[in-house]
Swiss-Prot record:
Source taxon at top rank: Bacteria
Molecular function, one GO term: single-stranded DNA endodeoxyribonuclease activity
Primary location: cytoplasm
Keywords: Cytoplasm, DNA-binding, Endonuclease, Hydrolase, Nuclease
Family, similarity comment: Belongs to the NucS endonuclease family.
EC number of the protein: 3.1.-.-
PANTHER family recorded: ENDONUCLEASE NUCS
HAMAP family with a match to the protein in the record: NucS
Protein's recorded name: Endonuclease NucS
UniProt key word Nuclease: yes
GO annotations of cellular component type: cytoplasm
Places the protein is found: Cytoplasm
Amino acid sequence: MRLVVAQCTVNYVGRLTAHLPSAKRLLLIKADGSVSVHADDRAYKPLNWMSPPCWLTETEGEGGDDTSESGAPTVWVVENKAGEQLRITIESIEHDSAHELGVDPGLVKDGVEAHLQELLAEHVALLGDGYTLVRREYMTPIGPVDLLCRDADGATVAVEIKRRGEIDGVEQLTRYLELLNRDTTLAPVAGVFAAQQIKPQARTLAEDRGIRCLTLDYDAMRGMDSDEFRLF
């Protein structure tokens, strides 16, 4: 991962256009190719970003501070396969470092979440009549989807399971769906957000994004026989 703290302007050119005026920002370039622009607020959310697959090239702009040997500012052009661009004009750099993080083991679920995943995989009909399990922990470039299933019509469904369903979980599933829907062997992929409790804000966000919410009764699921599929 490369971390750059720089005075910069940012322009996004694609289906829409967006402009960030000159300010000091943190630029993250990850090993997967993604580039994101952060301010000192908004928690983990970037001001703008480009998801992989995308490619970064550095060129010289016109005029500006001495950020290159010729005295011209450096322009980062981040482009994806659709031709959308994130253009970052670097006016000055305060910090630039690279770090090798290695392979991350991924999020380790607590006991209840892990057991919920196991139980729902075993009793997949709780998702709906005709559902079948493709596999647990279906890997994506950003981590594993809890369950990958097929509905009664054979369409692909990705299921994210939480003990407490909050906005972060919906955002996580949204990112999984974005990646899975790029796979022509799986698309279109629908989403199910399953949890013991789902906060109203998370439910509203999920439903707005076309993600179905499912409340899980952990005690009832633990009491089900392993060879029985029934709704509670």
